[in-house]
């Protein structure tokens, strides 16, 4: 299962700035539009899960809500307009026994407790250079409740470090996160500016 990108859709529909303004000026309109979008994603994924059965394990929910410093919005806005949609999507995934992976680039640190309470099992992509998203902080504060996918920095380290340094970084991350890490780049894809040798070094270190 995949996506449920209702936040992105709302930004496209209203325009991002207008969307955030309407959270204050026309909250009932924002709620109504969000509910219709989430209705669609809940129904679409419910049908997909019903037909697909046990052919896959993970429901990936994708919504980029963040900068490298914090949320695009206030915590109150997140809990009022975004979190209820997440909970509905998570509920349909759990109904079919799926593991819930949430994707959101940037510093999602401030709302991780809300996501854990909502039922998120895996956090992706662990943007390593974003505020409070270092491995030590995440493992210490949330390692008992979450698995992590990502963490190998694609903004600097994978681009500029040597393969030997990348190997050491992967081994360090594995040590910090223990068994709760799926080794991956810190974004959802590996960009062309990353040397192939470093990609190979990351993959090999993950298998050691």
Feature names for model-found ranges:
Residues 1-208:
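Active-site loop segments of alpha/beta catalytic cores
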């Amino acid at each position: 299962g995949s996506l449920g990108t209702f936040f992105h859709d709302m930004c496209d529909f209203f325009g991002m700035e207008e969307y955030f303004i309407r959270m204050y000026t026309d909250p009932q309109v924002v709620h109504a539009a969000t509910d219709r979008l989430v209705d669609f994603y809940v129904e679409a994924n419910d049908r997909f899960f019903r037909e697909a059965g046990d052919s896959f394990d993970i429901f990936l929910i994708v919504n980029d809500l963040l900068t490298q410093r914090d949320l695009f919005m206030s915590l109150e806005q997140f809990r009022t307009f975004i979190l209820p949609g997440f909970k509905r999507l998570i509920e349909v995934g759990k109904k079919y026994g799926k593991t819930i992976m949430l994707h959101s680039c940037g510093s999602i640190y401030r709302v991780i407790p809300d996501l854990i309470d909502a039922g998120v099992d895996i956090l992706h992509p662990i943007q390593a250079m974003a505020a409070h998203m270092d491995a030590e902080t995440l493992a210490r504060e949330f390692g008992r409740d979450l698995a992590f996918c990502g963490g190998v920095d694609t903004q600097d380290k994978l681009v500029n470090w040597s393969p030997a340094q990348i190997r050491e970084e992967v081994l360090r991350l594995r040590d910090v996160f223990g068994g709760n890490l799926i080794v991956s780049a810190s974004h959802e894809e590996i960009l062309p500016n990353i040397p192939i040798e470093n990609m190979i070094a990351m993959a090999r270190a993950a298998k050691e």
